[in-house]
Structures are given as C-alpha cells and as structure tokens.
C-alpha cells in the first residue's frame, strides 16, 4: 500500500499534498480555514448541482421553480437553504482566511496571495450572480444597480452594460447568462484552488511565529487531518444550526416578493458579505470614483507585499501594528453596518469616515507603524 501511495503517478500527488506533506508543527486553528473553504466549495457545488436539476432560468418561471424546489422536491428546502447559508459560511471562512493571511504576513508568498485575490473576486462574482437567480425583488434590483455601475466606465460604459444585459434592461437574457456563468464559475474556482495549493506547496506553509520552520516539520497526516476534521465538524454544526433553525436570518425579506420592474424596494442592498464594499461605493458621491473605490477595497490586498516595511513577518511581536489591525477589523464591521443602513444622516458621514479610515490604515498607518517598531527594536541591517 505504501508503495502504491508513493509511486503511483496520481496517488503520489495526493500523498504529497495531503498525507506526507511536511507541515510546521506550530500552526494554529487559524490555518484550518483553507480546508474549511475546500469543504464549503464541495458543499456549494453539490447542493448547486441538485438545485440546477429543478431550477428554470426563465423570468416567468424562475421564482416559481425555487418555490417548487422548497415545497415539492424531496428535501428541496434543505438543499436550497444549505446552498444559501453555505454561501454565507463560505464568506465567513474567506474573510477569516484573508484576515489570517494579513495578520501573519502570509502575503509574502506573492504567487499564492495573488491567486487568492483572483479567487476572492471569482467567489464574489459567483455569489452575486447566484443571488440574482431566485428572481425576487432584491435579486432583480440588486442586479440592476450593480451591473449599472459599469456604465460609469468612460466611453464604453453604456455599451458594455447593454452587452452584459443582453438588451436595454435586466431581463430574460440576463437571467439565462447569469445562470450559465453561476454554473461554470465554481469549476473555474476549483481549478484556481488547485493552482493556489500548487504555489503554496512550493514554499510550504507560514506559521504563527513568522520564522522559518524547516527544522521543525511534521507530516500532515494524521496530525492535521484530524485537526481539520474537528474544524469541518464545527463548520457543519454551525451551518446546520443556521439552516434548520434560522434559514432566513441572513437573507432579505424582499426576495420573497417576485421581481417587479415597476416597483423599487425602499432600500436596495446586497447580501451581508458585500455590505462593506457597498458602503465604500456609496460613500463617494461620484459614480466612477465610487466604482474605483469599490474595486480598490479588495484590490488593495495586492499592495500588501509592497506596503510591508517591518523586518518581522507577522504581527505576533508587533503591538502597534496589532492595534491598527484590530481597529481595521472594527472598521470593517462598521462599514458592514453602514452598507445595510439607509442613505441618510448620520450614516452617510459615518460611512465616509470609515471608508477613509479603511484606506488610511492600510496604505499609511500600518507601513509607518512597521518602521517605528523596527526602530524601537533597534533592528538595523
């Protein structure tokens, strides 16, 4: 058996990735989120596949087909709510995974980090298109508002929006293509995940100390397989509590009303995991400026390797930057809250201050703090 595991071309890849992989002995539970994201992706693909068997991507029947899934299909309600809340769990794990990377300086693995950013954009695009499919009020108006942002692009904007819509408004053509893209993207994401892991295994994992761990590695199996299984069980427990007790807590009641182009909801807002970016978008009065700020709110992650000024990798032994990091986390919670609140005083002002703070902390304060900490430690080359 050992012979096959180590010599067979296919099993050898699996063995070198999940069994005999040398792993730092001191990685904490913050390193569990990679495997949890893998499980989330599998759950989403499987539940999505079964939903697609019963869903129809036509404006006249889409809403009814989702109702049919929930009422008439065996365990359809379970599949539907696992898919909807599975997306929320996916994003919780994603944000924690990215936060861990930012805290422990994992962005110094630039290839792995950049593929991760591409993955984040791909998952966000998939989630957005998935939200349009039930064809409720918030689906329709969310799609209208977000796709309309592309019209801010100079010269080609309007043409681009109409090209994406497949007409002069969000309609049947839009829904059909969004379903097609929503179906294919998770498989593209799976391919990107493999590339993400490929680059990670070139360098090996980071660890909480930020130091080289070559002298103290242990095999991935059984130590981290059992640790990952514990994480997976906890994830599934939280997911099933959400699905079975509070299935609609993260959704919008407006989406239980069929899409009506003649009636605009009082407050158009995306799902909770986009609210921080939506708040940044809304805090800038100019349309193009807002769109650029929206994109930069995620793309700024690509600048982290260049903004790293400290001689230490992580924030484990850097108290000043640690404080800034947790202020940034609190700031993101504030942005999430503002994104779901109406556009009126004082929310507009709070949103603008939080947006300015977000970029200032990352671009200005953290690099300065890194230099100050180096000087305080008198670490000179």
Curated annotation (Swiss-Prot):
Question: What CDD domains does the entry give?
Answer: cytochrome_b_C, Cytochrome_b_N
What SUPFAM superfamilies does the database record attribute to this sequence? Answer: a domain/subunit of cytochrome bc1 complex (Ubiquinol-cytochrome c reductase), Transmembrane di-heme cytochromes
One of the entry's Gene Ontology molecular-function terms is: ubiquinol-cytochrome-c reductase activity
Enumerate the Pfam families for this protein: Cytochrom_B_C, Cytochrome_B
State where heme b b566 binds. 97, 196
How cofactor binds (record note)?
Binds 2 heme b groups non-covalently.
Where is it mostly found?
A: mitochondrion
Q: What cofactors does the UniProt entry give for this protein?
A: heme b
- The residues listed in the UniProt record as binding a ubiquinone, with positions renumbered to this chain, are 201
Report residues binding heme b b562: 83, 182
Q: What's the stated role of this polypeptide?
A: Component of the ubiquinol-cytochrome c reductase complex (complex III or cytochrome b-c1 complex) that is part of the mitochondrial respiratory chain. The b-c1 complex mediates electron transfer from ubiquinol to cytochrome c. Contributes to the generation of a proton gradient across the mitochondrial membrane that is then used for ATP synthesis.
User: Assembly state and interactors?
Assistant: The cytochrome bc1 complex contains 11 subunits: 3 respiratory subunits (MT-CYB, CYC1 and UQCRFS1), 2 core proteins (UQCRC1 and UQCRC2) and 6 low-molecular weight proteins (UQCRH/QCR6, UQCRB/QCR7, UQCRQ/QCR8, UQCR10/QCR9, UQCR11/QCR10 and a cleavage product of UQCRFS1). This cytochrome bc1 complex then forms a dimer.
Q: Which family does it belong to?
A: Belongs to the cytochrome b family.
Tell me the protein's name. Answer: Cytochrome b
- What is the native source organism of this protein? Peromyscus truei (Pinyon mouse)
**Taxonomic lineage per UniProt?**
Eukaryota, Metazoa, Chordata, Craniata, Vertebrata
Q: Which gene encodes it?
A: MT-CYB
């Amino acid at each position: 058996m050992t012979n096959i595991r180590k010599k067979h071309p296919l099993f050898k890849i699996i063995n070198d990735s999940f069994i005999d992989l040398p792993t730092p002995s001191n990685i904490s539970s913050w390193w569990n989120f990679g495997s949890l994201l893998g499980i989330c992706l599998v759950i989403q693909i499987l539940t999505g596949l079964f939903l697609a068997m019963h869903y129809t991507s036509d404006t006249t029947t889409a809403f009814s087909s989702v109702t049919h899934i929930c009422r008439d299909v065996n365990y359809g309600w379970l599949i539907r709510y696992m898919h909807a809340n599975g997306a929320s769990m996916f994003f919780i794990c994603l944000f924690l995974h990215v936060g861990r990377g930012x805290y422990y300086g994992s962005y110094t693995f630039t290839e792995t980090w950049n593929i991760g950013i591409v993955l984040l954009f791909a998952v966000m695009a998939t989630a957005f298109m998935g939200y349009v499919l039930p064809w409720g009020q918030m689906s329709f108006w969310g799609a209208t508002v977000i796709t309309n942002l592309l019209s801010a692009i100079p010269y080609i904007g309007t043409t681009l929006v109409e090209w994406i819509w497949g007409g002069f408004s969000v309609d049947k053509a839009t829904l059909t293509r969004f379903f097609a893209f929503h179906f294919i993207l998770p498989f593209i994401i799976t391919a990107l995940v493999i590339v993400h892991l490929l680059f990670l295994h070139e360098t090996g994992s980071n660890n909480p100390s930020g130091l080289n761990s070559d002298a103290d590695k242990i095999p991935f199996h059984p130590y981290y397989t059992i640790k990952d299984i514990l994480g997976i069980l906890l994830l599934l427990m939280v997911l099933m509590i959400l699905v079975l007790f509070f299935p609609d807590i993260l959704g919008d009641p407006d989406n239980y009303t069929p899409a009506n182009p003649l009636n605009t909801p009082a407050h158009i807002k995306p799902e909770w995991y986009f609210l921080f970016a939506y708040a940044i978008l809304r805090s800038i009065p100019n349309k193009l400026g807002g769109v650029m700020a929206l994109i930069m709110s995620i793309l700024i992650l690509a600048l982290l390797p260049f903004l790293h000024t400290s001689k230490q990798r992580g924030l484990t032994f850097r108290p000043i930057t640690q404080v800034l990091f947790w202020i940034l986390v609190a700031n993101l919670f504030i942005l999430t809250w503002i994104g779901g609140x109406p556009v009126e005083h004082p929310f507009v002002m709070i949103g603008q201050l939080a947006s300015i703070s977000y970029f200032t902390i990352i671009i200005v304060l953290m690099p300065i703090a890194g230099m100050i900490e180096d000087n305080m430690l008198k670490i000179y080359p």
